[in-house]
Amino acid sequence: MSGQFTISDLNRLYQRIIYRNERLKKFLKDPALSSSFEMKYAQRLLQEAVDNLIQNGKSGVVPEKDARGRLLKSLSDILKGKQGRFRQYLLGKRVDYSGRSVIVVGPRLRLHECGIPKEMALVLYSPFLIKRILNEKLADTYLSAKKLIRTNPLLVSQLLREIMKSCPVLLNRAPTLHRLGFQAFQPKLVDGKAILLHPLVCPAFNADFDGDQMAVHVPITFEARAEAWKLMLARNNLLSPATGEPLILPSQDMVLGCYYLTTNCAEKWSKLKKGSGMYFHNIHEVLKAYNQHLIHLHAVIWVNIQGHLETANNIEQPLEIRIPLNQKYFYSQKGSYTALAGRPWQLLLREDAYSSNGLIAEANAGNLPQINVAEGEVNKNILDLRYLNLNYMEIYSKTHNLLNVNHSTLVAQRGQIKDNIHLPQLTTQIIRTTPGKILFNIIVKNAIEKRPKLLSKSNFKGGFIKNKLVNAIDQEIDNYFIRKNTALS
């Protein structure tokens, strides 16, 4: 350029060695100078030139510089460092059909899915896209296919989504310390410029969402895609190949989200939440109301529950049980009721439920606020004519679940006739909870139901490894509740 020559730094260093070597030869040819001070100085200059070729400026030697005063790059300078020959050209290099971007959390993705920006996907899948356009006769030539991609974004997006269903991508995060640092995912087209990643696969990559970047590669050949689907798919790599420990564990944003779903607001603030105090017939009505923004996530609501429920007595409030007082089993005379239980349990009458009817004094007079039932059979008159105008009777159960107490029955007596009625036939279970806790329980239930399917898909058939996975998940849940209790206290 402009009559100037560009010379490599190595050529300058080799040139200096050649010049000094020729100078030393002249001294060696003259016997009078073979042992002189000038010849020893020439030997030293040659040695310094060779040292500068290997590592410029080593051991206090005057470094070689160009006309601008810049240090010349020696052999060691060319090999070492991030821009060196090994790291830039051998250990890592720029390849076709690859990209790089920042990762962000994608909570709505499946475990084996990732979100690829549309701008990046157009470049990565360009050979598949152009081939599809030409096969479907949407364009005649390569140039016209490229023009169609630029001018018809709606058609291109539709074709791109169909192509991405059968073409996986490989995600990698440096440094790749083990083989699970390179996994296959099914791509989904997303807006923006960031790659969406499921938070559960972060431990395998040792990644987080504070600005980490990941590389994307597209396997081109059929054999490479088949290997990615079979061996490298994220949902097929649940356990660490080195230790057998599970890699799919909740962390970071997921733990924070679980805590937010199950947190308890202060009583004075929970009453102000939208929808607090509402009653729902089942869980589906709660989810429907929440999706329609009719209730707040932390609103205290009452839900009718059928089935087995468990609560931790030191954390959750007791369950509320409602026994309907219908005319089928209760008459105008006193009824004698027997509770048969396999273990001691206790029922407490809710006095506040009768305050509007002025029945607190009557309940106290009839010795009704507390009914202790021990093992075996205990008879106690708990109903009178005075209470038959009620629609139901509310009681608290201090055990996990009144409906699931073994062999629990109520015996209704009318004269000499007794009707044995199972307690679940008479009771309706109402729970005081929040929509957030319902969502959390549904998520945990779905995860537990799908856990055997995930284990069956893995190649680990030993029961020991399966038990380690189950125990690790249970331990993680226990640790979460311990942290939650510590935060609440």
Swiss-Prot record:
Gene Ontology CC terms: chloroplast; DNA-directed RNA polymerase complex; mitochondrion
Cofactor note: Binds 1 Mg(2+) ion per subunit.
EC code: 2.7.7.6
SMART domains, alphabetized: RPOLA_N
GO terms under biological process: DNA-templated transcription
NAD is among the record's keywords: no
Reaction equation(s) it catalyzes: RNA(n) + a ribonucleoside 5'-triphosphate = RNA(n+1) + diphosphate
One Pfam family of this chain: RNA_pol_Rpb1_3
Keyword DNA-binding carried by entry: no
UniProt subcellular location: Plastid, Chloroplast
Cofactor: Mg(2+)
UniProt keyword annotations, A-Z: Chloroplast, DNA-directed RNA polymerase, Magnesium, Metal-binding, Nucleotidyltransferase, Plastid, Transcription, Transferase
Gene3D superfamilies: 1.10.40.90, 2.40.40.20, RNA polymerase Rpb1, domain 3
Molecular functions per Gene Ontology: DNA binding; DNA-directed RNA polymerase activity; metal ion binding
Residue sites binding Mg(2+) per the record: 208, 210, 212
Family: Belongs to the RNA polymerase beta' chain family. RpoC1 subfamily.
Quaternary data: In plastids the minimal PEP RNA polymerase catalytic core is composed of four subunits: alpha, beta, beta', and beta''. When a (nuclear-encoded) sigma factor is associated with the core the holoenzyme is formed, which can initiate transcription.
Other notes: In C.reinhardtii the gene for this protein is split in two.
Function: DNA-dependent RNA polymerase catalyzes the transcription of DNA into RNA using the four ribonucleoside triphosphates as substrates.
Protein name, entry field: DNA-directed RNA polymerase subunit beta' C-terminal section
Organism annotation: Chlamydomonas reinhardtii
UniProt lineage: Eukaryota, Viridiplantae, Chlorophyta, core chlorophytes, Chlorophyceae
